Amino acid sequence: MANSASGMHVSDECKLKFLELKAKRNYRFIVFKIDEKAQQVMIDKLGNPEETYEDFTRSIPEDECRYAVYDYDFTTPENCQKSKIFFIAWSPDTSRVRSKMLYASSKDRFKRELDGIQVELQATDPSEMSLDIIKGRVNL
């Protein structure tokens, strides 16, 4: 189904891989991109379970918009192992204006397709999605 605001479709593969990340924990992260010609959100990169947050941030282009989900593991003050799934909307200041508008207008519709997101971050530079920011958001 297309998003009425931007006309974007979400590929079935996006939904399937997200379910695998959420239920089976087959992936640590997924980076998504919009294919403007196909008018579709598709997978750009899949991160293996053993990959780190640093591997994740390196997989996102410096000057191009992307959506991403990251499965963050942490230990609570009560010593319980938990995880939260973060949705990150990456829209760097250096990306094209058209691209920023396209990602912004498609974000909510795309996010609704990914049932199970617990925390959302919007970032325009790497400091806005640092590991410290992620750690600070798990207890909100």
UniProtKB/Swiss-Prot annotation:
Q: According to its record, what are the GO cellular component terms?
A: actin cytoskeleton; cytoplasm
Q: Which family does it belong to?
A: Belongs to the actin-binding proteins ADF family.
Broad class of the protein's primary localization: cytoplasm
SMART domains attached to this UniProt entry: ADF
Summarizing the function annotation, the protein's role is: Actin-depolymerizing protein. Severs actin filaments (F-actin) and binds to actin monomers.
Name of the protein this chain belongs to: Actin-depolymerizing factor 10
- Record-annotated ADF-H domain positions: 7-139
What keyword terms does UniProt attach to this protein? Actin-binding, Cytoplasm, Cytoskeleton, Phosphoprotein
InterPro entries assigned: ADF-H, ADF-H/Gelsolin-like_dom_sf, ADF/Cofilin
**A GO MF label:** actin binding
Q: Which CDD domains match?
A: ADF_cofilin_like
Phosphoserine modification sites? 6
PANTHER family (UniProt xref): COFILIN-RELATED (PTHR11913)
Cystine pairs annotated here are none
Write down the species. Arabidopsis thaliana
- What is the gene name? ADF10
Read off the Pfam families from this record: Cofilin_ADF
Q: Could you tell me where this protein is found in the cell?
A: Cytoplasm, Cytoskeleton
One Gene Ontology term of the biological-process aspect is: actin filament depolymerization
SUPFAM superfamilies linked: Actin depolymerizing proteins
PROSITE patterns hit by this protein: ADF_H (PS51263)
